[in-house]
Amino acid sequence: MAGAAVSNGGLLPNMEDKMADDRLIVALDFHDIDDVVALVAELGDSVSFYKVGMELFYSAGAEVVPFLKNHNKKVFLDLKLHDIPNTAAEGLCSLMFQGADILNVHASGGYTMMKTAVDRLHALAEKKGMPCPKLIAVTILTSINEEDWAGLGMQCTIREQVVRLAKLAKSAGMDGVVASPQEAAAIREACGPGFMIVTPGVRPAGASV
């Protein structure tokens, strides 16, 4: 069972506790909502947080988020918005009404895009009397390797850019970032405690799948 780990203080959470832990987010990498229904039933109360990405949202988004919320689950809507500031911000405002607990954008969209998104989302939540979802930024996609990085013409290292983008996201008011476990320590040192770090592709200790 692969998913993402969330850290707000230490580097990585302890995954030994079998009770539901909001620091473990299970990825719903499906096209069909029937697969979601089956997995949520199988995992029951042991998991409280699920990640819905493009694959599932584009095929069943209108059904899957309400289904999860109706089962008292938290939702990380992983759509990685990246557009001009107004478009990204308005897209996030529309997604807020889905009931997601975490939304995200690409940090490479820049400070203005992230700041506009934060301000617009908080203003709308206050106006509507709704809880504001956490807003986090993707630093560098974990699939990017050194060859890909060089092809982009980047002069700094991947780690240096991850830290730079994390600090930019924090300065824009973002709640945290998505980054690989390899960069978690450097981000924590640069951004301090209380800044959310979501690390994808982790498995809890003792997981059989």
Label every model-predicted segment.
Residues 1-15:
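N-terminal amphipathic/basic-hydrophobic helices that include classical n-h-c signal peptides
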Residues 17-42, 46, 122:
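N-terminal glycine-rich anion-binding loop in soluble enzyme alpha/beta folds
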Residues 21, 87-91, 98-172, 183, ...:
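Conserved anion-binding
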Residues 24-28, 50-52, 75-79, 105, ...:
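Hydrophobic faces of well-ordered beta-strands that scaffold small-molecule active sites
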Residues 35, 60, 112-116, 186-187:
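Phosphate- and divalent-cation-binding pockets in alpha/beta enzyme and binding domains
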Residues 42-43, 68, 94-95, 169, ...:
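Generic structural signal for hydrophobic
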Residues 44-48, 72-73, 96-101, 173-175, ...:
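Glycine-enriched alpha-helix->loop->beta-strand junction motifs that scaffold or abut catalytic
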Residues 51-102, 106:
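Metabolite-binding pocket within alpha/beta catalytic cores that recognizes anionic/polar moieties
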